[in-house]
């Protein structure tokens, strides 16, 4: 048996900001420098990715876009946004480690009955 979980970062009034899918998109933007390429890599539309980027920029800041087309434009994440992603990933990893311990306990109980 497994214990599963999902985590996300939300505003104080409960609006989701960043979860697993958002982190994947932002990591792809960081590595490619392209919203279009990142959207393709994570199987979302360019429109969805662009709207998500605008939302993140409005709530957290830290995204710099340069217009210019092929070879001249690009998108970069700030150090602040890199830190937010790092905090999210650290929390996710710690929770996974804790849940593994509880899975072992659960499996001990369920297989020894």
State each model region's role.
Residues 1-14:
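Short, Lys/Arg-enriched N-terminal segment that forms or immediately precedes the first helix
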Residues 16-20:
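Short helix-coil-helix linker/hinge
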Residues 84-113:
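Helix-turn-helix/homeodomain-like alpha-helical modules used for DNA recognition
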Residues 58-76:
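A short LG(V/I)-centered, amphipathic sequence patch enriched
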Residues 32-39:
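Short helix-boundary/capping micro-motifs
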Residues 43-44:
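Central "turn" residue of the DNA-binding helix-turn-helix
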Residues 25-26:
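Short alpha-helical "packing" element that flanks the helix-turn-helix/winged-helix DNA-binding module
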């Amino acid at each position: 048996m497994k214990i599963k979980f999902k985590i996300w970062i939300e505003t104080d009034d409960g609006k989701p900001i960043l979860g697993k899918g958002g982190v994947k998109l932002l990591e792809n933007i960081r590595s490619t420098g392209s919203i279009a390429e990142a959207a393709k890599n994570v199987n979302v539309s360019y429109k969805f990715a662009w709207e998500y980027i605008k939302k993140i920029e409005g709530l957290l800041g830290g995204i710099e876009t340069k217009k210019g087309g092929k070879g001249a434009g690009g998108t970069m994440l700030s150090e602040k946004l890199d830190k937010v992603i790092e905090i999210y990933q650290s929390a996710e990893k710690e929770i996974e480690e804790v849940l593994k311990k509880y899975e072992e306990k659960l499996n001990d109980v369920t297989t020894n009955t």
